[in-house]
UniProtKB/Swiss-Prot annotation:
Keywords: 4Fe-4S, Iron, Iron-sulfur, Lyase, Metal-binding, S-adenosyl-L-methionine, Thiamine biosynthesis, Zinc. Homodimer. Pfam families: ThiC-associated (PF13667), ThiC_Rad_SAM (PF01964). This is Phosphomethylpyrimidine synthase. GO terms for molecular function: 4 iron, 4 sulfur cluster binding; carbon-carbon lyase activity; zinc ion binding. Pathway: Cofactor biosynthesis; thiamine diphosphate biosynthesis. Its EC number is 4.1.99.17. The gene is thiC. Catalyzes the synthesis of the hydroxymethylpyrimidine phosphate (HMP-P) moiety of thiamine from aminoimidazole ribotide (AIR) in a radical S-adenosyl-L-methionine (SAM)-dependent reaction. GO terms for cellular component: cytosol. InterPro entries: ThiC, ThiC-associated_dom, ThiC/Bza_core_dom, ThiC/BzaA/B. It comes from Escherichia coli O157:H7. Belongs to the ThiC family. GO terms for biological process: thiamine biosynthetic process; thiamine diphosphate biosynthetic process. Zn(2+) binds at residues 437, 501.
Amino acid sequence: MSATKLTRREQRAQAQHFIDTLEGTAFPNSKRIYITGTQPGVRVPMREIQLSPTLIGGSKEQPQYEENEAIPVYDTSGPYGDPQIAINVQQGLAKLRQPWIDARGDTEELTVRSSDYTKARLADDGLDELRFSGVLTPKRAKAGRRVTQLHYARQGIITPEMEFIAIRENMGRERIRSEVLRHQHPGMSFGARLPENITAEFVRDEVAAGRAIIPANINHPESEPMIIGRNFLVKVNANIGNSAVTSSIEEEVEKLVWSTRWGADTVMDLSTGRYIHETREWILRNSPVPIGTVPIYQALEKVNGIAEDLTWEAFRDTLLEQAEQGVDYFTIHAGVLLRYVPMTAKRLTGIVSRGGSIMAKWCLSHHQENFLYQHFREICEICAAYDVSLSLGDGLRPGSIQDANDEAQFAELHTLGELTKIAWEYDVQVMIEGPGHVPMQMIRRNMTEELEHCHEAPFYTLGPLTTDIAPGYDHFTSGIGAAMIGWFGCAMLCYVTPKEHLGLPNKEDVKQGLITYKIAAHAADLAKGHPGAQIRDNAMSKARFEFRWEDQFNLALDPFTARAYHDETLPQESGKVAHFCSMCGPKFCSMKISQEVRDYAATQTIEMGIADMSENFRARGGEIYLRKEEA
C-alpha cells in the first residue's frame, strides 16, 4: 500500500501520463508471436515465454546444457502486448474485424444515429474537449437480416471469429514436444466436453447449441474474438467505471489497458458518474477485449437518478445508444419480477444488486411487472441487429451467505431460463449471471440448477464469496468460491477486488483482483482436465527443481512480484543462480537435497552394476568370449 495518498489532481495527471506515453510492452523474457489461420486476416496473438537451458553435466570449464522449450500462453493484452505496434490512444486500435464484418454483406452504415441521447451529445459543442476524436460510423443489420455469431453458427457457417477462437483456445500447445511438459493428470469435468484439440467446427457447434457465446458487436471491430462457455478455458471479467464521486476518463482508459495486461478476458464499464457516454466511447475504441455494460445505470442517470421515473422509452434509447457505440454484452435484469420481490423480505441483506434494487423499486412504485420483462422481445430485436449478447442479470442474488440458495434466488434463475429460450428465437447469444455469497457446501447446486433450468447457457458468476468476515480480503474469500464453481462448469468469473464492499478500486486493486481470479480460473481448468492446462505448471516445477530462478519469475502470473519477493532477501545476482532461497537456506533446501539424493542413487546404481558384472566375469573363469550356449 502506498505510504502517501495521491490527490485527485495527481491521480488524473498520473493517468494522463500513462496513456500519453503508452507503448506496446512485453512481459520479461517474453515475445509476441502470431499463429495464422486459413481464413483471411486470422492471425492470433499469443505470448511466448523464453526459458534458459538446463545444466546437465560437463565441467566448470565446459558445461553441457539442454534447451528448454518456450512456453506459449493465452494473451489478452491485444496490441498493448506487442512492442512492434505503435499505440495512440487518441486514434484508438486497429479495426481487426472490420474486413470480416464487411465481407458478410449483411450490414449497412447508419446515416443518422438511432438514439436521441446520442444525437444530443454529438450536437453539444461543450463536449468537444472530452469527446473521442476518431469517427466510427455505426452499422446495423440490413432489413430482415441477423448478424449474430449464433445465427451464423446455426446456418453452419464457420466465421473467421470462430477459427480465431479455436486457435486461441488451443494455446499453441501443439508446439510443445517435451513429454515432461505435456504430462497431465486426468480431470473431473462434471459432464463438460473437452476435446483434445479444439477445432473451428467444435466452436461453431458449441455456439449453435447455445452452450457458448462470442461477444462481438459489429460496432466493436477492434476486439479480438474470444469465447465464453464451459467447454473452453474459464474466463475472467474485470469491472471498471467512474462514479459520481471519483475517477475520470483518463483513469478509466488506464484501468482498461491495465486490465487487459493482467489477463481480463472481458471488461465491464459500470460507470455511474458524469460523461458516461464519452467515457464509454474512449474505452471501446481502445479495447481489444469485449466490453459489457449495465444499461439501467445510464438510463437511471437520464431520469436524474429517480428509479420511479424510469420508462421503457428511456431504456430503449439507452440500448440503441450503447449498441451503436459497440457494447458487446448487456446485463439486463429482466428476471426481477413483481411477485418475487416479497420473497426477499425475510432476507438478512435484502436485494444487493444495484440493477435488481432499481427494478424492484420501479415494480413496487408502479405495482406493474418489470418493464424489461414485458419488453424482452423488443430487447432481443435490438440485440440481434448489432450482435449484442445478453447477460441475464441476477438481480436477486444473495448478498450474504445467510441468504444463499433461497427461494427468491432460484425463482429468478428459472425465469432467466425462460428468457434464454426467447432470446434464442431471435438468434441472440445469452449467458446467465450468478451469485454472489454462497458457502462452499452450497456452491455446486448453483451450477446444477443453472445447467438444468437455463439449458446449458454459459454461467457467469461474481465469485461467489464463501464467507462474509473479511472486508479488505474479499478477493480471497471469493477466489475460493470462483475456483470451485469454475471447476463445476462456470464459464466466466467476475473478479472481486480488495475494495469490494469498501470503495471504488484503483489500478493496484484491479491487478490484485485479476491475479486472484486468473489463479482461480487456471485452477478450475486444471481440475476439469482442460487439455494443455498443466504445461505451464510443469514448466514452472521443472524450473523450480533446477533452480532456474529467472525462469521461475518469468513463468509466474506476476513476474514482477515474484522477483521482488525473492530479491527482498537475496538481491545479489548470485542469488539468481543459488541452489536455495531464503526460506530454507543452503543446508535445508529440500529440492537441493533431493537432487543430491537422486545423483547419489544414480551413481550408486552404476557402481553396484559394475561390481556385479565384475563378479560375474570372474565366476565364469575370466573368459572374454563365451560359447553360445553359455552366454
